[in-house]
Amino acid sequence: MNNKVIYTSMFGFADNTDYYLHTPECKMEGWDLVCFTDNPNIKSDAWEVRLVTRYYVDGARDNRLYKILPHRHFKEYDVSVCVDADVLITNNIDDIVNEHLSEHNLSVLDHSICGMTKTGNLNRRSCIYQEADFIKWLGDNHPRKKYKDDMNIIFNQIKKYSEDGYPKNNGLARTTVIFRRHNEADVIEAMEKWWMEYKYNSRRDQLSFPYAVWKTGLDFKYMPIDIDDNQWFQLMKQWRKERQSKK
């Protein structure tokens, strides 16, 4: 068995046969690949598919149970890379993982540069307060006034963080890809805090991540990698659109 794992999760489509896992475009020597799902129709030659029980009505909550808490599920691995299910691995990631975990036990994409080359400033945000306003703006401008979450929940969460002294312009993670030495004590403490904040607040996990790592004092790294323009990961946007249209 390897000591490094790449993992993803896919919940909420247990009766649907349209969804699939993206097979990496390169050899993943030294890595195990694991997918957690409630869908018995998901099959893959590249990924070990682990069929697990759902605990929440909202599949996003089950997804985050695995996304946020790898130390509960991968005690036998030293290093984990979590990728969203709509991410295709396009090149060997050994060097980039080693680089970004050389001095930190956790590294995550920096939202302030994500989309900067192709989608412009609209997608570049560096603060949970900006993110909350952006979510409201998206919903207000949606033809059916469709919001990514209940805005009362979001604004109450943000208000709580503000009253606790959480600063503005303190960074924003894009949690599409996360590198971790997940069994280290400082990471475990921060991830358990993140889970508690996520579990009882908004389903938008990027709102609770910065607060959790700030509150626990985790020394982590924002990776200067644009998910829309890099050599290691490709966001399969069409797959995402098709998946969301079936919700």
Where are each of the predicted segments found?
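A residue-level signal for conserved active-site and pocket-lining positions in enzyme catalytic cores
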Residues: 6, 33, 71, 86, ...
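Catalytic core and acceptor-binding pocket of nucleotide-sugar-dependent glycosyltransferases
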Residues: 139-246
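Extracellular structured ligand-interaction cores
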Residues: 30, 82, 174-175
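N-terminal anchoring/stem segment of glycosyltransferases
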Residues: 1-64, 73-77, 200-204, 215-218, ...
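A contiguous pocket-lining binding segment that forms or flanks enzyme active sites
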Residues: 116-156
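GT-A fold catalytic core of metal-dependent nucleotide-sugar glycosyltransferases
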Residues: 68-116, 121, 127-131
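Short acidic (Asp/Glu) patches
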Residues: 61-69, 95, 151, 155-162
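Short His-Asn-centered micro-motif
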Residues: 7-10, 36-38, 83-85, 91, ...
